[in-house]
Design a protein with these regions (language model features):
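Short, surface-exposed linear patches
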Residues: 28-29, 116, 147
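C-terminal catalytic histidine-bearing segment of alpha/beta-hydrolase fold enzymes
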Residues: 127, 133-178
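Serine-dependent carboxylesterase/thioesterase catalytic core
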Residues: 2-5, 12, 50-141
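Residue-identity detector for threonine
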Residues: 8-11, 18, 63, 102, ...
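Generic intrinsically disordered, low-complexity segments enriched for polar/acidic and small residues
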Residues: 7, 47-50, 67, 148-150, ...
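Generic structural motif
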Residues: 38-41, 89, 146-148
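Active-site catalytic motif of lipid deacylating hydrolases and related acyltransferases
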Residues: 1-63, 155
């Protein structure tokens, strides 16, 4: 079983036409590359119930999960999900922004923070921008982290960027064909 999860950012809802939803639509066209295995490709909001969702994914017994995440989806959703998964996780992170799990720590999103990754995480794509007041935070830990690539977008448009979509689609093709 192959599992791909696209996690949207702050203020993004699944019913809205966002860069995350556009990416999810692109990735859904790839599931026929799975060479006989089943594939599910889900779009999730950053503040989903990650404990229940991880239980569901774990019940499918995948050997690896691919997560493409943006903003708080990368700074909160992805770390919350990946630490609960019982398999390796590959990540394409687009301008991930730290989000504290506590109410008192929420203001930390406006300062440079580090996003700690669990030991089962490999970052295969990492895009950020540095021009906006709210910019991507550093990823640390995990199995391995690829080089961060910085682009000339603001935070609210980088998830629509062709660079993010190309990197995510390439990672998904590689994942589905292995």
């Amino acid at each position: 079983m192959k599992v791909i999860v696209v996690i949207s950012g702050f203020t993004q809802k699944n019913h809205q036409n966002t860069g995350s939803k556009q990416l999810w639509r692109e990735l859904r066209l790839l599931d026929d590359l799975c060479d006989g295995e089943d594939a599910i490709i889900h779009l999730k909001e950053w503040d989903s119930d990650w404990k229940s969702y991880a239980e569901y994914i774990n019940s499918l017994e995948p050997t690896e999960v691919l997560i493409c995440c943006y903003s708080w989806g990368g700074g909160y959703g992805m770390p919350q999900l990946s630490k609960r998964l019982q398999c390796d996780v590959s990540v394409v992170a687009c301008d991930p922004v730290y989000h504290s799990p506590t109410i008192l720590g929420r203001w930390w999103a406006f300062f440079d923070r580090k996003i700690k990754l669990d030991k089962n995480v490999t970052v295969v794509g990492w895009l950020s921008q540095r021009g906006d007041r709210l910019d991507g935070d550093k990823l640390i830990g995990g199995k391995s982290i690829c080089r961060e690539r910085t682009f000339d977008y603001d935070h609210t448009s980088i998830d629509n960027s062709p660079e993010y979509h190309q990197i995510a689609v390439l990672a998904a093709k590689t994942y589905l064909q292995t």
